[in-house]
């Protein structure tokens, strides 16, 4: 199972969410699409990657729909 999460300028709650998902289903694959959040948010995405979350980054904000399309294309 792949769980797709679009993210723009996330906070630590995204890290907690990923942890909770992993606790519920250790086999779930989490995919986060960073929709151009910028360098300020690199520590959050780095923490997610350390925890085994797959990160795909848009260089600029393209909107939630574009982030979802990117994630769906990757998942196929």
Region annotations inferred by a language model:
Residues 10-13, 37, 64:
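Donor nucleotide-sugar binding loop of glycosyltransferases
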Residues 14-15, 41-43, 67:
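Short glycine-/acidic-enriched loop or helix-start segments at secondary-structure transitions
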Residues 15-19, 29, 69, 73:
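Amphipathic, non-transmembrane alpha-helical secondary structure
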Residues 9-24:
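Short, well-formed alpha-helical segments that are part of the catalytic scaffolds
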Residues 5-7, 34:
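Short beta-strand/turn micro-motifs composed of small residues
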Residues 45-74:
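Conserved donor nucleotide-binding strand/loop of the catalytic core
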Residues 1-2, 29:
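Cell-envelope/extracellular polymer assembly enzymes that use nucleotide-activated donors
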């Amino acid at each position: 199972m792949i769980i797709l999460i679009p993210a723009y300028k996330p906070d630590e709650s995204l890290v907690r969410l990923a942890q909770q998902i992993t606790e519920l289903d250790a086999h779930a694959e989490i995919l986060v699409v960073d929709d151009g959040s910028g360098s300020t948010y690199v520590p959050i995405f780095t923490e997610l990657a350390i925890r085994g979350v797959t990160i795909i980054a848009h260089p600029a904000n393209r909107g939630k729909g574009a982030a979802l399309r990117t994630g769906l294309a990757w998942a196929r």
